[in-house]
Amino acid sequence: MSARTVVLDDLQQEAAKDLQLLTNKPVLYVCNVDEASVVKGNKYVDAVREAVKNEKAEVLIIGAGIEADIAELETYEEKQLFLEDLGLKEAGVNKLIRTAYHLLNLQTYFTAGPKEVRAWTFRKGMKAPQTAGIIHTD
């Protein structure tokens, strides 16, 4: 039995955090499918979804072959046209990153200066002073 499937009240959740149970960690299941199944999935994706439906886990569908083809394209426009032709809104790698950030309760803050643009990762719900502590480490 996975700790993700157990319903706990707030006090119990706090106590469980101290145990650092591996089965309480967020899980992302990535299903690599063929091109025909990349939009809606297939019976195997459905089986994974059914198996983990009570786990508070995410199931993501990606076509590794499609991702390889996208990586070979030169321009953003070419990549967008390729994705549109397949009925996709974004590349699988982008979905993977976005889903992982969501699952881990993370957000990104961007800073821009004359020499560089940086992305800073912080936990959702952090206050501005805490986030500033990540950005301004000097």
What annotation goes with each model-predicted range?
Residues 1-138:
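C-terminal-of-GTPase-core extension/linker across diverse P-loop GTPases
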